Amino acid sequence: MAKKTAVVDLGSNSIRMVIFEKTSRYGFYTTCEYKRKVRLGENAYNNGKILQEEAMQRAEDALAFFKQCTLKHKCKKIFIVGTSALRDAPNSKNFIKRIKDNLSLNIRCIDGKSESYLGGLAALNLLSPFKDGTTLDIGGGSSELCLIKNNRIISCISLDIGTVRLKELFYDTGKMDSLEEFIKPILEQIPKEFCNQNLIAIGGSLRAISNSIMQKNSYPLKNLHDFRYMLDEEKGHILKIFNSNLDSLINFGIKKDRFDTIKEGIFIFLKIAEKIKAKQVITSGVGIREGVYLQDLLRPKITFPPNFNPSLKCLQDKFLQSKQKNKTPHFALQIFTTLKNLHKLNDNY
């Protein structure tokens, strides 16, 4: 497998790239991350789902920049996956060919179930151990759910409700009265088996909600990954965000680039959380990009070996190599010599 691998998630709202560096058979770490808010799905949902020229050009420009970044970092592999906006578009093949011709980059357009599976794969392997849970990844064009039971991926579904889709079809057109009627049959597509106390939150909208809760509660850590909260305890705060005006969102710790879709994200989140009877929300800092990488790293398996921690393995690979191990007695003696007078230790020790 390549030493450095880039994974690009070509979403309806944003294009994100992560560069991973492999340290050993299963050891790896994130070198850097890039994000461009290109809105590939902009004005597509009220125009027959056809990708618009301005949006395609923004996406092409972002991919050209990402390609330069991969060359700078000397990546040997580049995976680019297209999700909802691309798979829904009648002109998706034209866009994929355009990127191939202009940038020599290959885009793999994945279906909704594959997108759901990749998010579930990342959560299963990279969150603190959990036995059962249902992942929810709210994107710009769709929302994916993955059922995990007894540390196994059981089932995956994709729903045609996303933040950009709802924004263009209902919020921007003032047709809010029709929203409940629109979403009700979509929620009915969620099987009863997906009901779970643990909802694993994936995606920018859900991370923004978790970040706001962390700030409100003066949570001591800045790391969102694996942050957990009880939905009943925080629902009031979430509704305050939902009911606030745009100018007030910054007071809740919501970033400006999230202002125009956070309410749609909250609406989808609360409806699905209620449908699956979720009680605890587990925030995932990983998603489809990590899932794509793990699929390549772990194959033909889907999980790490028993009792294996990829983070610890990475630290071991980076800082405890054989040459450094040989210096341990040397450093130990230096520490002893420096502190022996303070602790009144005899040289014989």
Regions from the PLM with identified roles:
Residues T5-D9, G133-D137, L199:
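Short glycine-aspartate micro-motif
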Residues S12-S14, G139-L145, G204:
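Ser/Thr-glycine-rich phosphate-binding loops at phosphate-binding pockets of nucleotides
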Residues K76-I78:
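Post-signal peptide N-terminal segment of secreted/secretory-pathway proteins
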